[in-house]
Amino acid sequence: MPPLHSASVSKGIPRMLDPGRSLARGLAFAAWLLLLACSASERREPAAPGPGTRPNVLWVVWDTARADHLDLYGYARHTTPFLSQWSKDARVFDDALSVAGYTLPSHASMFTGLYPSEHCTNNDNVRLDDAFTTIAELFKGAGYRTFLFSANPHIASDPAGNFTQGIDRAEHPWSPQYAEEALRIVRAKLEPEDRSSELPAVLAAAREGRVQLSQGNIKAAGEIAKTATLRWLESSDAQKPFFVFLNYMEAHRPYIPPRRFREQLLSPEDVARSYQVDRSWQQMWEYTFGLREYDSDEIELTRATYDAALLELDDLLRDLLGGLREAGHLDDTIVVLTADHGEQLGEQHMLDHQYSVYQAVLRVPLILYAPGRVTAGHEARPVMTFDLFPTLLELAGIKKPPGSRSHALSLLAPQADRVRFAEEPATPKIGIEQVAPLHPGWDPSPFRRRLRTLIEGSHKFIWGSDGRHALYDLAADPHETHNQIADQPELAAKLASDLDRYFATLDRCKMPSHPHDRRQLTPEQQELLKGLGYIEENKRDPRKP
């Protein structure tokens, strides 16, 4: 079995590669590198800092935050007033895409600089293999102290996900020292009249001792992340620079922004109505599958509630950075703000962020704050979130592993003509499994497919494993409402061919013979994932007693 030889160097554990592709893949990758060399003449190389002058790194992920709902990116509602002001001293990337539309593959790609088809971490295999060297391992190896706080159980719950490779300490809102405070925070967010999700019933069960851990803890990341980070910074070795990664889940469903944030965006009448729209998982899946409807007012109230959650995140970021600055921890610190993916909010008759590679789930915020290292301003050239892997290493003066290769590029010199690729490599099963028993005769096959997309300039081609493809002109149709594949067959054929050639350059992995699926998680981890819709609650109709 050949050793690992992609962007992340092998750690002595052989990686499962697909035999028979090596020569073709190598030639394709060589051709891609030649094109890259020809277009990188304007590359800016900052002076590599010495070991004693390496910057700190604070990397914040707003889980499920889509770029076009931030006023920083031109949105009509003022959802991010602090971020808009703070980012005036940062580089704002106006056209940043994630490599995938959900947590597992997108985080694994940011951590390794690899595409999902190269690391094989997805809905069918929830574990990031030890064979891949993560960015945290590289920072730790360069003398950094490393910390991770995540409200997303997939990222924080080891050994299941294995995302904490290279992390000195990993914490989460259900850590024993924070669990009680997390429940208090979440209960304070909920109103007695809230009928929008399953969360009030879950918290009631937690109060009565019928569940050991509450799904609601994931919604308390903001306040606790600040406390946990400050405590760790004060207790760890201050002689070493730090690498801190934080994941916030306030914008992930269930949406429970406190009333004060709803009141800043909605009329009193709409604030009251926002608590009454049924956004339980069953209802949202049925809507996505075309089995039920929301009226236009319900969709708009869903969007407004999501926007209020973004406003809450903005306030939490202000509090986090203020606390770190007051404690003296922002001196010579690079700050990254991005998202792992976005959210469907009624577009294409979809909610949540599964079964999709549309812009609503791929286009995310990306802000890089590094005064003295990166020039402030807006950057319009196309980039991707896994570009953070080589960029942060470069800014810290840390060398990439010998022999590594990757399609991830430095954010310090974006390419105007860059071709971008994203994918949904494994069919999400949870929605189908939850809905099918309640709808005998329903055919879920249109949703049982893998998706890939290639974007060249304004043209976006979507490939479906079931033979249903799509073509959009993002300049004229940014919301992807008009499929042009029948109108422009020649362009569609060209982009399909380009996608095939691009996909051939990937150092594709093979799924493990015994993948780590969610059935192997502990009961506590499964309980948390139920709150995110990642694990089925039960198959009875929640509308019936």
Model-derived features with residue positions:
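Bacterial N-terminal signal peptides that target proteins for export
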Residues: 4-27
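Bacterial N-terminal signal peptides
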Residues: 26-37
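Catalytic domains that recognize anionic headgroups
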Residues: 3, 36-545
